[in-house]
Each structure stands twice: as structure tokens, then as C-alpha cells.
Amino acid sequence: MKKISETFSYGGKQAVYSHKSNVNNCDMTFAIYTPPNEKNAPILWYLSGLTCSHVNVMEKGEYRQKAAQLGLVVICPDTSPRGENIPDEEDNWQFGSGAGFYLDATNNPYDKNYNMYSYITTELPQLIESNFEFDMSRQSICGHSMGGHGALIMALRNPKKYKSCSAFAPIVEPSTASWSSEAFKKFLGENKDVWNMYDSVSLIKNGYSFPEILIDQGLADSFLEEGLRPWLLEEACKNTDINLKLRMQPHYDHSYYFISTFMADHLEWHKERI
């Protein structure tokens, strides 16, 4: 693991590291904010959306002041593998670099590198545990858009690993959304049973559960009707044990102006449950 940068902020440290990923067969980069009293601190994972890297939320998310106050570690991984030898479609912002969809690809040639589900749930936490003294028994997860999708499926499939889950404008049913279904086909092939394992609505319909989920969604979001469709998740959660808190926010769009407005709320919500 190599430290790329480190800067003090609100008494804690904002750092960026790179490391060799075995599951993605490339070097990966992540950002991490450690609060002033970092030993045995709980962890909040933040998963970013399409076209993003660890940089976007680090520069625009406005999480550090509240994380320092609450004593939360915030880890922001990249959204995909990157590099010259990574298969990609340079002109397609909805697939490949910056658009790994937090799944483990099964189709050649993508299966050698696009294993973001295993990376986030297993490999990166193991690296963190080996290099820091955080409390790995207290982890929570959140994300935005594609990252909200990632947070939801990881929480639903690993309810004992994460203490809480929240999302900003998540893609709740990527298997049927226009900007994600084609990526699923390229990454996963035609087997819809495999697709369902990376689709939060399908997971819930198939009996997967998580105690409580918080979602904020902007009503001025241009992707709301075709790409996000939170009402599908709301419908899936009916008659289940999932306590879904869906907050539809007037006037807000899909940008980091929206995310940063409600970031402190989400951090406080997670700290109460972690």
C-alpha cells in the first residue's frame, strides 16, 4: 500500500492511497478520512456514482467536519478498475472505466478485472484491517446513484457485516434501467438469475433483507423517472421487515450540491446505528 497524499482537516487526516488489487488485477486507489481519535473508530464506506472516482466526494461531499465531530472513518473507494490493460469503452460513460456497477463480472474479458463487489466487501476491508486500528466490527455503508445501488446490494447480501445503510438517489433496479441494463448484459451475460444478485429490488423480492434503509432523492433529478425510480424499492419493501425511510426532497437534482446538503444527516444517522 502506497500513500499518495495526506492533508490535515478538522483535526483529522484526509489521505489517498493506492495498492495492488488481486481481485481486479490492477492498482486501485481509495480516499480515507480518519477523525482525530482514529483508534477503534467505526467505518462508513461511501460508494460513488457513474463517471466518478474517489476524488469527487473527497472534494465536494463536505463530510469531514461532521465525521470529525462524530469520530467516523470515511472510506471512499474508486468506482472501477483502471489502467491501459483494462477492457473499456472510452466513449461510453455508462460502462467500463468509472462504471463498474459494483458487481463481479462473469463474462470474458471483463471477469479478470471488474470484480468490484468482492473488492469492496472483502479485499479492501482486509487491507484496511491490516494497516489501521479501526473497529472492523462496526462498519456501515452508503453511496450515490450507482454507488447507492452498490450500497443497497451489499447491505442486503451482507446484513451482518454492515450496521446501517443509506443512499443518495440510488439506482434501485439496475437490471431494467436504461443506463445500466446494457452494462449488466456485457458484464454478466444473459443469465438473469445472476443479474438478480446485483439488483436490490430483485434481492428483496427473493427474500433478502436489511433492518433499516435511509434514502434521499431529489425531485428535480433528471434521472428520476427512467434511471432511479425509488418507488420500485418502496413497493418491494412493503410487507417485509425492512424499515425504508424514503425522503423525496423538492428542488434538488442529482449533483453534489444535493449530496452535500444531506451528507451530515446521513453521517449522524449512521453514527446512531453503528
Walk through the language-model features, giving the residues of each.
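Non-catalytic cap/lid and distal C-terminal segments of serine-dependent acyl enzymes
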Residues: M1-I274
